[in-house]
């Protein structure tokens, strides 16, 4: 298996610190709002990578944090008239709801930064003691010049960074690029007791501390969105390696941005979507497959038209699964015949090809193509004349390959019936309101999917054709 390591800017053989085990840390959300589709891509990508590693036999300890104390949290809490803790509690709950709806598996642990204050203070104290940090008027800064390899992740030179820095320079700092690891309390802000007075941690130190305490001095994979590479991950490396003298993370993985209608997503451009808004209109499988239809290191463009195309493609997959489920009930032959055994063995090539693609830096786009190829083959060769054993095997194989991607796991019968009944209700409502255009559109859309409606005195019935 090869993974692209941002630290070295090349694909490397994936060799874990302990054979068969993976220690993985992913930077999670700042819990002051619902997460948007850009965040959703990051969460889906690393959920998929975690699932695939488990599929390949690794035992994965997966940590994804909640940032529940920072400037954004404080600003939002003050605007709402709530406490930072109340805000964090609320949006952590909302995160779990949306993540569950998106079929994102629960992490081994989701630590909150505020649960680690004692450990953070110890971390900061150690850095001061080792000469990597200094205190001024209750603020503590990390000295970037003391860490000789600062810039190694982002490939940036410290002197060039200093020259081009647009940061509002605090004249008290020894160097413009030094960053805060502990902040002195300001009026109206939550604070904790420390050797430097009342204050709170800087953002970067929180992740370093949680990773250290939950996974140890060196971890296998540290991951997050590409926007975190600098300065967040660069600063994490500096703090962690300055403290321990050991490599912080062996492999650094970064997922690329989501653009909306070929523009960067932003509230000012009015092209900002939360995952929840999209999940109200589309199933999780659609959003997941869309997010995984491009390589995770490549930017993807989001639009409703592209989601509709993804849904249409996914419907074709589910129609094939539905046909196989129906065949399972209808076929007469129970046991595999000799010629079927040969065909069953031939189907293994799709599993091998899928693994080959996913082993190459988690190429989900090509892996999805393999699933489509498999289903095209099965549609042609698995029929009413096939044995029950072969039909079941093909169904199991499709679901096996869909599982690491978090798609194709539902029984189509239950989900299809639920969706159709919902559309029939919408059509009935449109007819009552004499909205004939909408009623006809719903009927025609269903017909395109192979569903025919029959209006009877007993109500609307439907059947597949």
Swiss-Prot record:
Keywords in UniProt for this one?
A: Aminoacyl-tRNA synthetase, ATP-binding, Cytoplasm, Ligase, Metal-binding, Nucleotide-binding, Protein biosynthesis, Zinc
What is a single Pfam family found in this protein's UniProt entry?
DALR_2
The question of whether Lyase is a record keyword is answered with no
**What biological-process GO terms show up in the record?**
cysteinyl-tRNA aminoacylation
Keyword Transmembrane helix in annotation: no
Residue positions of motif 'HIGH' region:
29-39
**Alphabetized SUPFAM superfamilies for the sequence:** Anticodon-binding domain of a subclass of class I aminoacyl-tRNA synthetases, Nucleotidylyl transferase
Q: What's the domain of life for this entry?
A: Bacteria
| CDD domains documented for this protein | CysRS_core
Give start-end ranges for motif 'KMSKS' region.
264-268
The name this protein goes by in its record: Cysteine--tRNA ligase
Q: Which organism is it from?
A: Clostridium botulinum (strain Loch Maree / Type A3)
This protein's gene is called cysS
């Amino acid at each position: 298996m090869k993974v692209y390591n941002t630290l070295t800017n090349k694909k490397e053989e994936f060799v874990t610190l302990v054979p068969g085990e993976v220690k993985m840390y992913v930077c999670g959300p700042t819990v002051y709002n619902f997460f948007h589709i850009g965040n959703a891509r990051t969460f889906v990508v690393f959920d998929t990578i975690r699932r695939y590693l488990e599929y390949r036999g690794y035992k994965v300890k997966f940590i994804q944090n909640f940032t529940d104390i920072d400037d954004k949290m404080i600003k939002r809490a003050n605007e709402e008239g709530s406490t930072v803790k109340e805000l964090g509690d609320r949006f952590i709950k909302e995160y779990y709801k949306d993540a569950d709806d998106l079929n994102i598996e629960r992490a081994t642990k989701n630590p909150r930064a505020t649960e680690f204050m004692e450990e953070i203070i110890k971390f900061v104290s150690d850095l001061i003691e080792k000469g990597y940090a200094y205190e001024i008027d209750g603020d503590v800064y990390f000295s970037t010049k003391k860490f000789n390899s600062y810039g190694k992740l982002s490939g940036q030179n410290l002197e060039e960074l200093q020259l081009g820095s647009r940061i509002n320079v605090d004249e008290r700092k020894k160097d413009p690029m030094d960053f805060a690891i502990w902040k002195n309390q300001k009026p109206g802000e939550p604070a904790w007791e420390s050797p430097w007075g009342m204050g709170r941690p800087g953002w970067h130190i929180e992740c370093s501390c949680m990773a250290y305490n939950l996974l140890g001095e060196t971890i296998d994979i540290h991951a997050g969105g590409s926007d975190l590479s600098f300065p967040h991950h660069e600063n994490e490396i500096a703090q962690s390696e300055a403290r321990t003298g050991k490599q912080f993370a062996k492999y650094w993985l970064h997922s690329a941005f989501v653009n909306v209608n070929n523009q960067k997503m932003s509230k000012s451009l009015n092209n900002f979507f939360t995952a929840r808004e999209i999940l109200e209109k589309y199933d999780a499988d659609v959003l997941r497959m869309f997010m995984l239809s491009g390589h995770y290191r490549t930017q993807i463009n989001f639009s409703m038209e592209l989601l509709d195309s993804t849904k249409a493609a996914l419907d074709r997959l589910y129609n094939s699964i539905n046909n196989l489920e129906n065949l399972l009930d209808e076929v007469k032959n129970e046991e595999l015949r000799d010629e079927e055994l040969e065909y069953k063995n031939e189907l293994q090539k799709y599993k091998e090809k899928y693994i080959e693609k996913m082993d190459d830096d988690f190429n989900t786009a090509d892996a999805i193509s393999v699933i489509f190829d498999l289903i095209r083959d099965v549609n042609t060769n698995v029929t009413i004349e096939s044995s029950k054993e072969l039909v079941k095997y093909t169904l199991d194989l499709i679901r096996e390959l869909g599982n690491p991607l978090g798609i194709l796991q539902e029984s189509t019968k239950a989900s299809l019936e639920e969706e159709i009944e919902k559309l029939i209700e919408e059509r009935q409502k449109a007819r009552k309101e004499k909205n004939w255009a909408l009623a006809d559109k719903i009927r025609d859309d269903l017909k395109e999917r192979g569903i025919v409606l029959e209006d009877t005195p007993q109500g609307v019935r439907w059947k597949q054709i």
